[in-house]
UniProtKB/Swiss-Prot annotation:
HAMAP family found in the cross-reference section: GatC
Oligomer status and interactors: Heterotrimer of A, B and C subunits.
Family: Belongs to the GatC family.
Protein name, entry field: Glutamyl-tRNA(Gln) amidotransferase subunit C
Species this chain originates from: Chlamydia trachomatis serovar D (strain ATCC VR-885 / DSM 19411 / UW-3/Cx)
Enzyme class: ligase
Length: 100
């Protein structure tokens, strides 16, 4: 049996915080799956990487000096752009409400 890292109450709380509807019948499945994933992550964490040069595997910070200079271009007009959107209003793209 896999070690228990999370329990039923934590899965229910996590689903509630993520605004997910989780049926009671599936809670135990998620508990088992989550514990399996965490156990696998624990195995990966336990791997000895002391002989690996980490500097070679980490990307350096991308700063302004690494970015190209902005160039203002006009590839198409506002009307051409708006001709490809389903709904526009006052020269703007109208999108569905995503936050209640």
């Amino acid at each position: 049996m896999t070690e228990s890292y999370v329990n039923k109450e934590e899965i229910i709380s996590l689903a509630k915080n993520a605004a997910l509807e989780l049926e009671d019948a599936h809670v135990e499945e998620f508990v088992t799956s989550m514990n399996d994933v965490i156990a696998l992550m624990q195995e990966v964490i336990a791997i000895d990487i002391s002989d690996i040069i980490l500097e070679a595997t980490v990307h350096h910070f991308v700063g302004p000096e690494d970015l190209r200079e902005d160039m203002v271009t006009s590839d198409f007009t506002q009307e051409e752009f708006l001709s490809n959107v389903p709904v526009s209003l006052g020269g703007l793209v109208k999108v569905p409400t995503v936050i209640k």
